[in-house]
């Protein structure tokens, strides 16, 4: 992702911004943004989505610049990237709404372009569906039964995300989360410039319209906005005053150094060490491990222990639901498992009433701390709406760490 981001992202911005001063500013801001150093370096689907969005904009721009020719290769490339983007993330098209509407008259004016896009897109969809079907069914592809047994991952993804109960498992957020909390978290001091002096060009509206559509969903994570970051940074004008420009650049550097430290060294940093601890200490002990309010744990890191250990990702499930899942998984019957592991951030204050000795019996479960990794902060757990700004910051940063709890059921003494 490092090479893909720095080469393809910069190349795309070079084409999207023909004026040298604008291009130089955009490349400087994107390259110096902590988002590029941290989030964009991960193998997130959001990172790939960012690159695909930029290159779709490049191809759309090339097609608009040459309206005389059909440009078959460009149409095929655009169709391929469009399908790839949708199969990568179902939300991908929201960042292309404005440029797509803008391109539509050019496609209608040259119907053969539209025909090429549809044919190339259909072929790419067929290949993607065939690949997914073979991967998820685990059997050889049989074209005679492909349309009966096919796996349509974008459709399944869309159906899953349209169910509010499913999104609630990942955590619910207010509709303003993206604009008021997530975007300032990603752009910092660039927000005032974005509001006051940005160029309201196609890049700006692509980013803003995408964020607006994503705000309609009640599960909103900052990483969902990665494609908007280079689009909005490329729209910014630096202050004309030399003194103001130097002051702003100083704030920009400090913000990104601080954010890079937090997101590069602390944000969800305990997931891998804790998973490695589980591999070392529970490899010979058949165990059920529940992960709560963390990134999805990489099961491959368990190695051979993966056969002995059952991993369940509870995502952002509510506290009471999480307790019910724990209780249901432990039995007092002889010959059954009497213990499970719970991995949860130290900032999860919901657990306090159950992990204290005095109150543990009320829940019917006993919690014993087995391991704790201090270098961990879960910034996906910023609940400003319910807790307020200062209490949330104190909770997330003051109680940093990722804990492993041995959870057992308090069973009545057999007589």
Language model features: what each stretch is:
Residues 1-4, 8-33, 205:
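Transmembrane-helix signature of polytopic, membrane-embedded enzymes
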Residues 104-119, 192-208, 216-220:
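Membrane-interface helix-loop-helix junctions at transmembrane boundaries of multi-pass membrane enzymes
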Residues 177-202, 211:
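Hydrophobic, aromatic-rich transmembrane alpha-helices
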Residues 242-414:
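Catalytic lumenal/periplasmic loop and adjoining terminal transmembrane helix
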């Amino acid at each position: 992702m490092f090479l893909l981001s720095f080469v393809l992202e910069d190349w795309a911005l070079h084409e999207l911004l023909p004026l040298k001063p604008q291009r130089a500013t955009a490349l400087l801001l994107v390259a110096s943004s902590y988002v590029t150093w941290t989030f964009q370096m991960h193998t997130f689907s959001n990172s790939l989505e960012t690159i695909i969005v930029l290159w779709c904009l490049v191809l759309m721009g090339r097609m608009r610049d040459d309206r005389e020719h059909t440009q078959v290769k460009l149409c095929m490339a655009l169709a391929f990237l469009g399908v790839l983007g949708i199969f990568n993330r179902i939300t991908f098209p929201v960042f292309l709404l404005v440029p797509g509407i803008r391109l539509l008259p050019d496609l209608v004016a040259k119907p053969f372009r539209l025909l090429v896009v549809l044919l190339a897109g259909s072929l790419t969809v067929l290949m993607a569906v065939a690949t997914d079907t073979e991967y998820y069914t685990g059997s050889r592809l049989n074209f005679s039964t492909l349309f009966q047994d096919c796996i349509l991952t974008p459709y399944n993804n869309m159906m899953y995300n349209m169910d509010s109960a499913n999104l609630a498992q990942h955590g619910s957020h207010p509709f303003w989360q993206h604009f008021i909390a997530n975007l300032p978290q990603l752009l910092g001091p660039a927000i005032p410039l974005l509001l006051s002096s940005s160029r309201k060009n196609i890049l700006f509206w692509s980013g803003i319209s995408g964020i607006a559509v994503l705000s309609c969903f009640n599960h909103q994570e900052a990483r969902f906005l990665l494609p908007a970051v280079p689009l909005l940074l490329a729209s910014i004008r630096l202050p004309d005053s030399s003194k103001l420009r130097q002051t702003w650049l100083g704030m920009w550097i400090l913000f990104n150094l601080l954010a890079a430290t937090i997101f590069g060294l602390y944000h969800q940093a305990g997931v891998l060490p804790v998973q490695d601890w589980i591999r070392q200490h529970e490899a010979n002990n058949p165990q059920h491990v529940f992960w709560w309010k963390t990134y999805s744990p990489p099961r491959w890191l368990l190695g051979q222990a993966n056969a002995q250990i059952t991993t369940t990702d509870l995502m952002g499930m509510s506290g009471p639901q999480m307790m019910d899942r724990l209780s249901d998984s432990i039995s007092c019957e002889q010959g059954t498992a009497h213990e499970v592991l719970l991995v949860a951030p130290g900032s999860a204050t919901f657990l306090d009433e159950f992990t204290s000795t005095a109150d543990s019996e009320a829940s019917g479960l006993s919690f014993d701390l087995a391991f704790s990794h201090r270098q961990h902060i879960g910034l996906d757990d910023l609940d400003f709406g319910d807790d307020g700004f200062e209490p949330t910051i104190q909770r997330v940063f003051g109680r940093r760490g990722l804990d492993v709890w041995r959870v057992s059921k308090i069973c009545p003494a057999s007589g």
